[in-house]
Amino acid sequence: MGCTVSTQTIGDESDPFLQNKRANDVIEQSLQLEKQRDKNEIKLLLLGAGESGKSTVLKQLKLLHQGGFSHQERLQYAQVIWADAIQSMKILIIQARKLGIQLDCDDPINNKDLFACKRILLKAKALDYINASVAGGSDFLNDYVLKYSERYETRRRVQSTGRAKAAFDEDGNISNVKSDTDRDAETVTQNEDADRNNSSRINLQDICKDLNQEGDDQMFVRKTSREIQGQNRRNLIHEDIAKAIKQLWNNDKGIKQCFARSNEFQLEGSAAYYFDNIEKFASPNYVCTDEDILKGRIKTTGITETEFNIGSSKFKVLDAGGQRSERKKWIHCFEGITAVLFVLAMSEYDQMLFEDERVNRMHESIMLFDTLLNSKWFKDTPFILFLNKIDLFEEKVKSMPIRKYFPDYQGRVGDAEAGLKYFEKIFLSLNKTNKPIYVKRTCATDTQTMKFVLSAVTDLIIQQNLKKIGII
């Protein structure tokens, strides 16, 4: 009897049908476990137009739930901020001339010291004073050229999709096909830009003849990364440049006048912070603080994932680049989203896009939010709208009327609360679904305020997720 039982057992084990069933059971069990893990994972999508403050929100999440920033990140930001500080002051000098603003530093007789500071600054090439590999390697260099070379303005437009709704279509196909009209428009734009840029370059070369022997516009990037890395000469030291920037920022009235009109051209949003703290950034061995990193900006390219745990809940935050050329990648992370965090820069109602200076940033954000909110991809997905940079908004509305850019605004000039309610109403009115939209007012660089806001938001999202999976 024992042999018979043994033979039967061996026969069962070798039965192909039984083997397939057991294999299927293992696969099914694995899928169920994975499905359960997916249910427990809260997947957030962080979206918004370029320079809205998305990445700063993510930095705050890292500070709260990931233990902050690595030593390498702190060194990287120190390099990037130093380069941006030099270029930002150069931009103010050059833009002042384009805007017809008289600079004290242009007068070598009555303002000899400031004139000398200007010469020091415009002779300095920012890339000579940083370690490009620490700053981010080729990604940093490419972004640097696109940001600071006026010759690349046309290239930024070409890389742009040209319209907010061209990020993706409802069938899931990435919209990257240009019509004949698009091509004709680009050709005309390139010709117009070429004429205008050539004219500007000639004028700038004339202006810069007193700055160096070549008469080159120092804002234009003329070196390849290989040439930069191979260059050993250091005619100026960091302290010289820092002192020049500090003197120009504190003592040249024209620089401050130009800065007050920075909505008319592209300038780093934290330029004033860089200038106010320029001496510490001048140290080649400086290690950035949390505040420095929150103020600094490194362009988001592609899609980054950040994971952290809050209690028993696992969060995954997807941060996608906000500029138009990056949006075609968004569709790859639309599936399985628990909530969308949309970041809106309130203070940029009077500014133009970096990638297309013919388009108002707030108008772009409105169109983008409308497209995402009513997309089939997010039919039942709750949205959390961050009205960001409200500190800058509250200051700006005192001198820059909202009605100048939004004629239907009826609130009092300088009334920040009325302005916030006006824009909040615009965004909420776009909702053509029954999904909830939660609005939070934020200053993403204020750690204490963001700690409170993000704690409230994560608690809300956890509750929403528990409802979704049927636990409550």
Swiss-Prot record:
Documented effect of changing residue 364 to K: Enhances the rate of GDP for GTP exchange and slows hydrolysis of GTP, resulting in a constitutively active form that down-regulates the pheromone response independently of the pheromone receptor
Regulation of activity is described as:
Alternates between an inactive form bound to GDP and an active form bound to GTP. Activated by the G protein coupled receptors (GPCRs) STE2 and STE3, which serve as guanine nucleotide-exchange factors (GEFs), and inactivated by SST2, probably acting as a GTPase-activating protein (GAP).
Kindly list the residues that the UniProt entry marks as S-palmitoyl cysteine lipid attachment points. Answer: 3
Which domain of life, per UniProt?
Eukaryota
UniProt-reported outcome of changing residue 50 to V: Has increased GTP occupancy and moderately reduces hydrolysis of GTP, resulting in a constitutively active form that down-regulates the pheromone response and causes hyperadaptation to pheromone
Q: What is the effect of changing residue 302 to S?
A: In GPA1(SST); weakens interaction to SST2 and blocks its negative regulatory effect
Binding-site list for Mg(2+): 55, 300
Q: Where is this region: G3 motif?
A: 315-324
Q: Name one GO biological process term.
A: G protein-coupled receptor signaling pathway
The G-alpha domain sits at: 40-472
Where does it reside? Cell membrane; Endosome membrane
- Positions binding GTP in this chain are 51-56, 294, 300, 322, 388-389, 391, 444
How is it placed in the membrane, per its record? Lipid-anchor
One further remark on this entry is: Present with 9920 molecules/cell in log phase SD medium.
Name of the protein described by the UniProt record: Guanine nucleotide-binding protein alpha-1 subunit
Q: Which organism is it from?
A: Saccharomyces cerevisiae (strain ATCC 204508 / S288c)
